[in-house]
Amino acid sequence: MCFKKGNTELEDKFNAAIKELKEDGTFDKIIGYYIDGTEDKGYESPADVDRSNGKLVMATNAAFEPYEYYENDKIVGVDADFAKAIADKLGMELTINDMEFDSIIAAVDSGKADFGAAGMTVTDERKQQVDFS
């Protein structure tokens, strides 16, 4: 996942949420469903999740199954489920915006999206433009 350069506050929140989700097995279940085929379903938000901490916008390119793709007019996949689980931990409402892959970093850098996730490889060139978790 990538963040606007210098947005350490959001990146730190993500890293803390990721740590919790790894420890409680949520990430393993997501991988089990989409990659390994060992789980019956992907991530589902708890009914009582509090989303009072605002909105979180994810930029993606939903053409990279199993990481992000459309199913019944909804973006699903590993990255989408990871993002939902993180947003739930942060108490935020998630919006996922589908766009061309080459537009993701620009959307994050300009503030049109809070973060990007699209099976993106971390490269030296990209590390000059955005920060990665």
Predicted segment positions?
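Charged, alpha-helical scaffolding/interaction elements associated with membrane systems
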Residues: D24, N72, S110-K112
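Disordered inhibitory propeptide/activation segment of secreted metzincin zinc metalloprotease zymogens
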Residues: I30-M58
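A structural signal for short loop-to-beta-strand junctions that line the ligand-binding cleft
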Residues: M1-F3, S45-V49, D79, K127-S133
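Acidic, polar ligand-binding/catalytic clefts
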Residues: K5, K84, D88, E93-S133
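Hydrophobic/proline-rich hinge and linker segments of small-molecule sensing/allosteric domains
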Residues: F3-K5, K55-A62, F132-S133
